[in-house]
């Protein structure tokens, strides 16, 4: 073994890239370390493409091993199971910047596997995994127009931009941004922020790109020392005769089809034209395959749409570059639910529902850095009917998890603190129609549904997706892109925020040469679009509802003496269990005596409050209580008048007349009203029944005159 090791300083961290010692049968393998966090990144590429392969089969798998943090997995099987949401999101984070760097026409299968084998608790391994993947691809010899660098950026007003901040530093940061790019271009941005202005966000992107050049340089040096020979791969030659034939016979018809503004009608017409082209050019006796015809047909579609946009002609649906599609905003659309909204923008529609629960409904997340609870969940569902198709239903896909997380980032900064609003919140966005930017429709719908549920958001949030078409003779930034514009364009740029600033920014770029000017233009257009959408939303609901829905759980916090906690819980939990069973409420008790009570309705809540007040109540001199006789003795009776509290009614306090036998007046189990007369220094309570009885009328006549 002759391992090659490359070390370099990256901000406050030392990065180590090592190859040639582990996983030597992979096409490329690098053990990347950042401090005490290590990720083994491997790349395997198939030397030959599968016959008939017409797309690039790239798969990226990021996996966190429990042993990396010195843990044993939970569960019955005690081994890692299906990917967690964090693993899925990081897999997408690695995939997005590397995918556009493989050359057009390269359809050999490539698999990237990143395994976290050692982890510090205060460092997210994702940046280390991205750097390791870049290095593994660079030394593999697989055709790849890299390498890439990656950086996480934080921001505080006091310190400015922070490079690769730890979890502790991020806790006080107003920004959490991940940027990836090559030596010359930014390729991907993923971020959440606390209402930061556009210039700060753009500055963070440029700062990250500048700092990541250290990574690009180090990976290039590693590839020079340890790289394998570059594959002898050439793209298939263009069949110019086929291109010319399709242009001559179908270019005009395709152009007319792209004037049809209705998505389904447009798709039907294009499908019809595609079938005609296949029948005409790939029929019997032809050496041209159906796939070849469809591929060239698709490129012709792309060229037609792009050239029109750059030339300033109307877009597919007739809009100019800055117009947002017609909006329709509704709230309170569903009965029984806690909050709901229907947000429609053109042919994209999201039905969003907000549900409130108790603290115990929070999601428990067992991560490498330790276990924590999450009291806000946003789930995004994209059923096949939303695009008029039949399709697979079942487990949540990577795309749905990624879009849900983006929508969550947009809204999360505006949520109230847990001590102000102690509910667990779950938002579900059902995409019922889709033609572009359903994740941003989910942001708008989530904001509306949460306000409809009475959640005190700091400000309403809206989101918009921007696109880009860039040609040699100019570029056009498109506001509120359609699905076709996303597919045929060069950039997907999503911005969510309030009227005051940006809360989430996601950018995926398919080409090099995106300049600062283009990003500035996109952010400026996105701001105008966001303010327009917010004005439409505010016309329907501008403030959170003053009270929660009647269907939402009711909540009350009370403080008790910590010494009383054991009385509320009871022996083996019997008392608290009886309260929850009788009232239907759920109760959480903190060690400091804070009691949080959640009831399904007002009656449930009040019932639980009353029971706890009874249990924790202290006897007060002069107060009247309803009690039950629990024991009779010669000198009086003991009466239970509060949970766990008995007092003595002395024989002299039973009646106004002289009492010879207590049993003539009282029986065990009898309910009586008693008045608290005194509590001595030893805590013994003296009660009286006599004090509550009417005074007897005096007998005997008046004096004679």
From Swiss-Prot:
One GO MF term: magnesium ion binding
InterPro entries attached to this UniProt entry: ExoRNase_PH_dom1, ExoRNase_PH_dom2, ExoRNase_PH_dom2_sf, KH_dom, KH_dom_type_1, KH_dom_type_1_sf, NA-bd_OB-fold, PNPase
Domain KH: residue ranges: 553-612
Catalytically driven reaction(s): RNA(n+1) + phosphate = RNA(n) + a ribonucleoside 5'-diphosphate
Cofactor(s) required for function per UniProt: Mg(2+)
Keyword NADP in record: no
Binding residues for Mg(2+): 486, 492
Domain S1 motif: 622-690
GO CC entries: cytosol
Function as written in the Swiss-Prot or TrEMBL entry: Involved in mRNA degradation. Catalyzes the phosphorolysis of single-stranded polyribonucleotides processively in the 3'- to 5'-direction.
NCBIfam families assigned to the protein according to its UniProt record, in alphabetical order: polynuc_phos, PRK11824.1
Family, as annotated: Belongs to the polyribonucleotide nucleotidyltransferase family.
Subunit structure: Component of the RNA degradosome, which is a multiprotein complex involved in RNA processing and mRNA degradation.
This protein's name: Polyribonucleotide nucleotidyltransferase
Annotated source species: Teredinibacter turnerae (strain ATCC 39867 / T7901)
GN (gene name): pnp
């Amino acid at each position: 073994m002759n391992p090659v090791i490359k070390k370099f300083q990256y901000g406050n961290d030392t990065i180590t890239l090592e190859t040639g010692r582990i996983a030597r049968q992979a096409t490329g393998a690098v053990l990347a370390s950042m401090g005490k966090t290590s990720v083994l990144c491997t790349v395997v590429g198939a030397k030959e493409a599968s016959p008939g392969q017409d797309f690039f089969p790239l798969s990226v798998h990021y996996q966190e091993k429990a042993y990396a943090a010195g843990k044993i997995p939970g569960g019955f099987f005690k081994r890692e199971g299906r990917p967690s949401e964090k693993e899925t999101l990081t897999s997408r984070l690695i995939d997005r910047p590397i995918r556009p760097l493989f050359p057009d026409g390269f359809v050999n299968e490539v698999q990237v596997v990143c395994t976290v084998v050692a982890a510090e608790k205060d460092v997210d391994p994702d940046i280390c995994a991205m750097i390791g993947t870049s290095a593994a691809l660079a030394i593999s010899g697989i055709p790849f127009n890299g390498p890439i660098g990656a950086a996480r950026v934080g921001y505080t007003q006091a310190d400015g931009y922070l490079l690769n901040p730890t979890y502790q530093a991020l806790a006080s940061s107003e920004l959490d941004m991940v940027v990836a790019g090559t030596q010359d271009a930014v390729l991907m941005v993923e971020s959440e922020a606390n209402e930061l202005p556009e210039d700060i966000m753009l500055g963070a992107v440029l700062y990250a790109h500048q700092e990541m050049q250290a990574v690009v340089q180090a990976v290039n040096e590693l590839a020079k020392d340890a790289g394998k020979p570059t594959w002898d791969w050439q793209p298939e030659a263009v069949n110019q005769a086929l291109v010319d034939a399709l242009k001559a016979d179908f270019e005009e018809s395709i152009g007319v089809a792209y004037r049809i503004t209705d998505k389904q009608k447009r798709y039907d017409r294009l499908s019809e034209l595609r079938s005609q082209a296949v029948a005409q050019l790939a029929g019997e006796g032809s050496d041209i395959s159906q796939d070849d015809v469809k591929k060239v047909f698709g490129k012709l579609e792309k060229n037609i749409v792009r050239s029109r946009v750059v030339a300033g002609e109307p877009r597919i649906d007739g809009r100019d570059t800055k117009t947002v599609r017609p909006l329709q905003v509704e709230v309170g659309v569903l009965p029984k639910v806690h909050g709901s909204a229907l947000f429609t923008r053109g042919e994209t529609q999201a039905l969003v529902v907000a549900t409130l629960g108790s603290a115990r409904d929070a999601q428990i997340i067992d991560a490498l850095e330790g276990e924590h609870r999450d009291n806000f969940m946003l789930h995004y569902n994209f059923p096949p009917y939303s695009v008029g198709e039949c399709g697979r239903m079942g487990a949540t896909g990577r795309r749905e998890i990624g879009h849900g997380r983006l929508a969550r980032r947009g809204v999360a900064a505006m949520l109230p603190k847990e001590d102000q609003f102690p509910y667990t919140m779950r938002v579900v966005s059902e995409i019922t129609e889709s033609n572009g930017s359903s994740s941003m429709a989910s942001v708008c719908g989530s904001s509306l549904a949460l306000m409809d549920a009475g959640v005190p958001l700091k400000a309403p949030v809206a989101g918009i997706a921007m696109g880009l078409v860039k040609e040699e003779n100019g570029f056009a930034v498109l506001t509120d892109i359609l699905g076709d514009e996303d597919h045929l364009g060069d950039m997907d740029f999503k911005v969510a925020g309030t009227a005051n600033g940006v809360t989430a920014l996601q950018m995926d770029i398919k080409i090099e040469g995106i300049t600062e000017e283009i990003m500035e233009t996109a952010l400026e257009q996105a701001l105008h679009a966001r303010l327009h959408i917010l004005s439409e939303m505010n016309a329907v609901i501008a403030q959170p509802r003053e009270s929660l829905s009647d269907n939402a759980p009711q909540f009350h916090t009370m403080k008790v003496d910590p010494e009383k906690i054991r009385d509320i819980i009871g022996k083996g939990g019997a008392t608290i269990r009886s309260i929850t069973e009788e009232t239907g409420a759920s109760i959480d008790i903190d060690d400091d005596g804070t009691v949080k009570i959640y009831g399904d309705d007002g009656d449930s809540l009040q019932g639980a409050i009353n029971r706890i007040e009874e249990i924790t109540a202290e006897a007060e001199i002069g107060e009247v209580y309803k009690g039950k006789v629990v024991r009779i003795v010669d000198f009086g009776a003991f009466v239970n008048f509060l949970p766990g509290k008995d007092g003595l009614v002395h024989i002299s306090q039973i009646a106004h007349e002289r009492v010879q036998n207590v049993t003539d007046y009282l029986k065990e189990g009898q309910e009586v009203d008693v008045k608290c007369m005194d509590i001595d220094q030893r805590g013994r309570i003296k009660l009286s029944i006599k004090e509550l009885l009417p005074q007897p009328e005096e007998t005997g006549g008046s004096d004679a005159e």
